Curated annotation (Swiss-Prot):
It is found in: Secreted. This is Zinc metalloproteinase partitagin. Optimum temperature is 37 degrees Celsius. Its cofactor is Zn(2+). Optimum pH is 7.6. Its EC number is 3.4.24.-. Inhibited by EDTA, 1,10-phenanthroline, cyanide, and serum alpha2-microglobulin. Not inhibited by EGTA, PMSF, leupeptin, pepstatin and aprotinin. It comes from Hippasa partita. GO terms for biological process: proteolysis; venom-mediated disruption of extracellular matrix in another organism; venom-mediated fibrinolysis; venom-mediated hemorrhage in another organism. Coiled coil: none annotated. One of its GO terms (molecular function) is zinc ion binding.
């Protein structure tokens, strides 16, 4: 989840965590 946009990175991290 190495996205230049911190919000998108945060969202991705939580999405994978919830999965």
């Amino acid at each position: 989840a190495y996205d230049p946009d911190p919000y998108k990175r945060y969202s991705a991290e939580h999405t994978f965590f919830l999965l």
